[in-house]
Amino acid sequence: MFFLSERDKLDLSIFASFQYIRTAETRRMLKDMSNCLEQVLREMKVSDEVIDKYTMKDGDERNIHGNMILDIDHIRDMALCFYNLTWILGINRTSVDFYTSDNPIGTIPHVKNDFISMSGIRSEGVEVFFPLSPKHILIMYDGSYHKWVAPYDRRYVSIDEIDWVQEYNRRSVYNCNRCVFSKDGDLSVVD
C-alpha cells in the first residue's frame, strides 16, 4: 500500500524544495561558492574589476537567497529532482526518537568522487533524509543507483534497529546550523 499518491508526492516535492533552500545553510553555501570563485580568480591574476563583477559583496547572499526562494522555475526544477527520487516512509518502531534540526533535510553521498561533492539532491547515489516526526522519516534515494529500493517507492518500511535511528540522528546533528530538536530532550547522540 502506498503512503501517498503521485499527486501528493508532487505537492510534497514542492514543499521539500522550499524546506531545502530556506535555511541559513543555503546562504552559507552561496557565500562559500563566491569565496572559492574569488580565490580562483585571484590565483589566475584576474583584475579586481572582474573579481568585483563576479563575486558577492558582504550581505549579497541574503538577496540572492531571497531571489532563489521566489524563483518559481528554480523551485519547480528542484521539486522535480525530489519527485524523481524513490521515496520511502520509515516508521520508527524503536524506543529512540528521531531528531530534527534547523536544517532538516540532509543528504548522504554513496558515490565517492575526489573532485566534486556527491551530496547534492541531483548527485548519483545520493540518499536524502527528512525527519518528519519523532517516529517518521522520509528517506529518498537515487533509484538509478539504489536499484533495490525501486519496489518500495511510496511505501512504508519499519525501522526496528536503534542503530539506524541513531545514525540518522548523528547526521541530523552534523547537518544542523545551530539548533537540534528532540521531542523528549534526549540528545545523547550529540555527546
What are these regions (language model features)?
Residues M1-D191:
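Alpha-helical structural context detector biased toward long hydrophobic helices
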